[in-house]
UniProtKB/Swiss-Prot annotation:
Keywords (A to Z) from UniProt: DNA-binding, Mitochondrion, Transit peptide
Predominant place of localization: mitochondrion
Name listed for the protein in its UniProt record: Single-stranded DNA-binding protein, mitochondrial
Annotated GO biological process: DNA replication
The species this protein was found in: Arabidopsis thaliana (Mouse-ear cress)
């Protein structure tokens, strides 16, 4: 920085008790000061300027504890097991619940395990977005292929029969989640660019 800017910032930061007269005259091309030059002003200015702390990159480290937010996103492609049904909660909001099965692929790690599919994994999907919930009820049926993107959450509730506290892991689709029905047998030439753009956004 030039010395004039440093001195002006020093004047602005100094108290009104010690008046400092700096007169500035404008020349043909530049500004210059007719006041005395203080060599310590530049050092004082650099000491008073607060430096911004450098941003630390976040890594996946479980030792960081509660301060680390982590990533808890799930992307599921599979077949619908239980058809979507809507429930009305006590607060008046509507939640759409259905299950999606994934798996059934062949396990190549076992010797002699030809044509032995792995058991399917079932995932409970809870759609808290009303628009996506109505889409799921209208479009999805049992055995239809679906793409689901949402957050992994654990719902804790009290069992009314045994009075035990139970927890259920589920994939919650909220405002930033996605649900798309996957259609087989369609030619790529029949799909418009708007539909492709909608699926990517």
């Amino acid at each position: 920085m030039n010395s004039l800017a440093i001195r002006v910032s020093k004047v602005l930061r100094s108290s009104s008790i010690s008046p400092l007269a700096i007169s500035a005259e404008r020349g043909s091309k530049s500004w210059f000061s007719t006041g005395p030059i203080d060599e310590g002003v530049e050092e004082d200015f650099e000491e008073n300027v607060t430096e911004r702390p450098e941003l630390q990159p976040h890594g996946v480290d479980p030792r960081k504890g509660w301060g680390f937010r982590g990533v808890h996103r799930a992307i599921i492609c599979g077949k619908v097991g239980q058809a979507p049904l809507q429930k009305i909660l006590r607060n008046g909001r509507t939640v759409t619940i259905f299950t999606v099965g994934t798996g059934g692929m062949f396990d190549q790690r076992l010797v002699g395990a030809t044509n032995q599919p792995k058991p399917a994994q079932w995932h409970r999907i809870a759609v808290h977005n009303e628009v996506l919930g109505s889409y799921a009820v209208q479009k999805l049926a049992k055995n239809s292929s679906v793409y689901v993107e949402g957050d992994i959450e654990t719902r804790v509730y009290n069992d009314s029969i045994s009075s035990e506290v139970k927890s259920i892991p589920e994939i919650c689709v909220r405002r930033d989640g996605k649900i798309r029905m996957i259609k087989y047998g369609e030619s790529i030439s029949k799909i418009s660019f708007d539909e492709l753009k909608e699926g990517l956004i």
